[in-house]
Design a protein with these regions (language model features):
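Conserved donor-binding/catalytic core segment of Leloir-type glycosyltransferases
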Residues: 5, 169, 212-228, 234-237
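Glycosyltransferase donor-sugar binding loop
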Residues: 40-41, 221, 246-259
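A short, active-site helix/loop in glycosyltransferases that binds the activated sugar's phosphate group
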Residues: 146-187, 194-196
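A short helix/loop element that forms part of the nucleotide-sugar donor recognition site in Leloir-type
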Residues: 198-211
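A short, well-ordered alpha-helix in the C-terminal region of glycosyltransferases
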Residues: 207, 350, 357-372, 378-384
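Nucleotide-activated donor-binding/catalytic signature segment of Leloir-type glycosyltransferases, i.e.
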Residues: 258-281
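Short hydrophobic beta-strand element within catalytic cores of glycosyltransferases
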Residues: 310, 314-317
Length: 408
């Protein structure tokens, strides 16, 4: 079976680029894949360049008739996914919906093309007067945009994409349940895949990053947004007043938000900014505890969370959205309510004081990711679903088939 796969690749800095640069090599065991990327850049991953046919997407010359299926990886970043949206609207196919809420995508699209009337019509088409109000608020910088509020999940603006989808792949029950009542075509949940683990020298990593080898290292990684709860996290860790704690934040601060939360007196904070993937994994591997909160959610899944769990770290997460899908024994869940800060303090204190508990949570996290999110299992599920959509015999998804793939 031959497919055309549309996805950003590095150096386009999105989690979806990283996701596919690992998944591609497993998926090609089952499918013949041509990659279609945005015009104007060259992928930096040498292995991807060497092993796959990569084409810039040119609307005037693209011919879908040479493929059994078209697979579109859709996210909320217009810069990375704008060309994918345009291709999907012209040539419907199977959509991997990485983000449930696409309000930010359309706002960036309007900002890029300046067509406010089109943007307003789209909002009004799906949400009536409320949609028109959402569109008008974009022009008022003093108003909180919809994608930074809890109301975003009620007005996701994904309908336009779903109308062009022949079938949909999602990564959480949260998104599947939100979509399935109004979407009457095939939909399947496939877990985000685990990432290949590397071996790091803990003390060397800490030395290279300027972190004391004896520090209690807590880390958060990924893009810095308001919904990552850094204001609450920093306040909670500061109130613990534990000089052994070093908190490292690694990620691009697009809105320069962290400056609003600093001024803490009792906490050793290191801000690393954007790190390349190797350094990011090294930081996680050298950490004692990880924090990955997110509220309100846009329905996204977190590759950062799977990396943290895969490396056997106890992780504090928000008990909402896709994070709530994880078993209680594999992560430490915190409700996004008035007690959020107190539970951060309580969990961190318990993890520091009870080494056996800390180790057990990390081990269960790693086991869950290893068993339920193996890249071999996820690739088999992708290929089987796509073959079924193309009226081809689906693949066997069994433990034996997964183990056989690991040896290939």
């Amino acid at each position: 079976m031959k497919i055309a796969l549309f996805s950003p690749l590095n150096p386009i800095k999105t989690g979806i680029s990283d996701y596919n640069e690992e998944m591609l090599f497993e998926l090609r065991k089952h499918l013949d894949i041509d990659l279609f990327i945005q015009r104007g850049y060259e992928p930096v991953n040498e292995a991807v360049r060497a092993e796959f046919k990569i084409h810039p997407y040119v609307p005037e010359t693209f011919d879908p008739s040479g493929y059994d299926e078209l697979l579109y990886h859709m996210g909320n970043n217009y810069e990375a996914h704008g060309y994918i949206y345009e291709a999907l609207k012209e040539h419907p196919g199977v959509v991997v919906l990485h983000d449930y809420v696409l309000q930010g995508f359309y706002a960036e699209r309007y900002d890029a093309n300046g067509d406010f009337e089109m943007y307003c019509r789209l909002q009004k088409k799906y949400y009536g007067e409320r949609g028109e109000s959402i569109a008008n608020n974009i022009a008022r910088p003093e108003t909180l945009p919809i994608w930074e509020s809890a109301a975003a999940v009620d007005y996701p603006l994904n309908e336009d994409v779903l109308e062009s989808a022949k079938a949909v792949i999602v990564h959480s029950n949260f998104i599947k349940e939100k979509i399935q009542d109004g979407f009457h075509r095939p939909i399947v949940k496939i877990n985000s895949h685990a990432y290949a683990l590397k071996t790091f020298d803990r003390n060397r990593v800490r030395d290279q990053m300027g972190i004391n080898k004896d520090s209690l290292l807590i880390s958060s990684i990924g893009y810095i947004n308001k919904n990552k709860r850094f204001d609450v996290i920093l306040s909670a860790l500061d109130e613990l007043n534990n000089p052994a704690i070093t908190y490292v934040i690694a990620g691009k601060d697009r809105g320069n938000l962290l400056k609003n939360y600093f001024g803490k007196k009792n906490l050793n904070i290191i801000v690393k900014g954007h790190l390349d993937l190797g350094d990011l994994e090294a930081l996680v591997a050298a950490s004692d505890i990880c924090i990955n909160l997110r509220y309100p959610t846009m329905g996204e899944s977190s590759g950062a969370l799977l990396r943290m769990m895969g490396y056997g770290k106890p992780v504090l997460v928000t008990n909402y959205g896709s994070y709530a899908d994880f078993p209680d024994y594999s992560v430490l869940k915190i409700d996004p309510d008035i007690d959020e800060k107190e539970y951060i303090k309580r969990f961190v204190t318990t993890l520091i004081q009870e080494e056996d508990f800390c180790r057990s949570v990390g081990e269960e996290a790693a086991r869950f990711v290893r068993e339920e999110c193996s890249i071999e299992k996820c690739a088999l599920e992708y290929a089987s679903f796509l073959k079924n959509q193309a009226n081809q015999p689906p693949l066997e998804i069994s433990q034996e088939a997964i183990e056989n793939d690991k040896s290939r």
